[in-house]
Amino acid sequence: DDDEMYASFQRCAELGAMPLVHAENGDVVAQLQAKLMEESNNGPEAHAYSRPPEVEGEATNRAIMIADMAGVPLYVVHVSCEQAHEAIRRARQKGMRVYGEPLIQHLLLDESEYAHPNWDHAAQRVMSPPFRNKLHQDSLWAGLQAGSLQVVATDHCAFTTAQKRTGIGDFTKIPNGTGGLEERMPLLWTYGVETGRLTMN
């Protein structure tokens, strides 16, 4: 709830701490999940449908505004879409202390992963926020180039195939998370530095 977020941010300001937020509008996500399940859309692809970029962009903007009112800097984790990146970029242009972190997975994998005919393949890529299309990836790379996004992380949270299969028939029960810790730096070098998108520094 926003009142709890504001109170938490105020306490962080008192302590000199910087809060981290995973920005998605959970109320809207829950409504979309219920609608998709009612329509028997229960596979891994529905995970992405239930978490469109708008729920992330709205939540990112709201968290930024609340943090600013509380007088605390903010670190936004798992930035996956243009809407969230733009909220961060605009806030930084206004002098707000906001930092954004895309994941290597969001920079390189897109939403087509969820349409894979092999259920296990698609489920192994279920994470939140979900993968987006190439336009969102381009925005994230541009943010890293321009400095409006600062860190590339992994949110490493791997599950076995058996664990992922607990969501067969109900995408909301697929454990959210993928690996990435070991691969992050080589992939960032190959697809960032070697392509000229990023410098070594």
Give the positions of each predicted feature:
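Histidine/acidic residue-rich metal-binding segments in metalloenzymes
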Residues: 1-152, 168
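Short acidic-hydrophobic catalytic motif
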Residues: 155
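Basic, amphipathic juxtamembrane/active-site segments
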Residues: 162-173
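C-terminal structural cap/anchor segments
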Residues: 177-201
